[in-house]
Amino acid sequence: MRSGRRLFPLLLLALLPLALLPGLCHGREPAPGAVTCGSVLKLLNTRHSVRLHSHEVKYGSGSGQQSVTGVEASDDANSYWRIRGKSDSSCQRGTPVKCGQAIRLTHVNTGKNLHTHHFPSPLSNNQEVSAFGDDGEGDDLDFWIVQCSGTYWEREDAVRFKHVGTEVFLSITGEQYGHPIRGQREVHGMPAANHHNYWKAMEGVFIKPSLDPAKHDEL
């Protein structure tokens, strides 16, 4: 009888629906707040409270490419970025972005990709970050790995972006530009992971997470 009593709870557990046992399926399904491929969003640097930004202003030194900055305003249309994969087939619209996945961030208004390379940044002498390419097509220096702690990049998470080609982290340390982009902050790459390179998804149009890219809705 004692062994029968021990077996009864195990048999009951086996008969329960999986929906009543959420811990057994943890990590298989994306949470409703997962950031997805194709979503358009703004990214807030959590240390300096500025949003990742670009515009049709080129650097006067270094690469001479389109500049990338941080702005305090939350309503600036030049702060929207589209989430894309290393290729369009690797990150279909509506697919949740996994921690450790390489993505591209394409500036919506100019069609250029977030980019870095071995040029010094103009103010802090870290690594220059620019916007590069045409109509969303650039080169292999446009790839960034999303670093987060779970299975998927969640909207509530503070995440890091580590550059695939040069291994720097997308960062802000507070330096401000003068004319013609007075008050905007320098965005650059830093070799070390620290509190200057945490980012959080903010305003935007998010595609509802789905493991089946054919089934999605905009939120």
Q: Model-found features: residue ranges?
A:
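Lectin-like carbohydrate-binding module/patch detector with strong preference for beta-trefoil
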Residues: 2-219
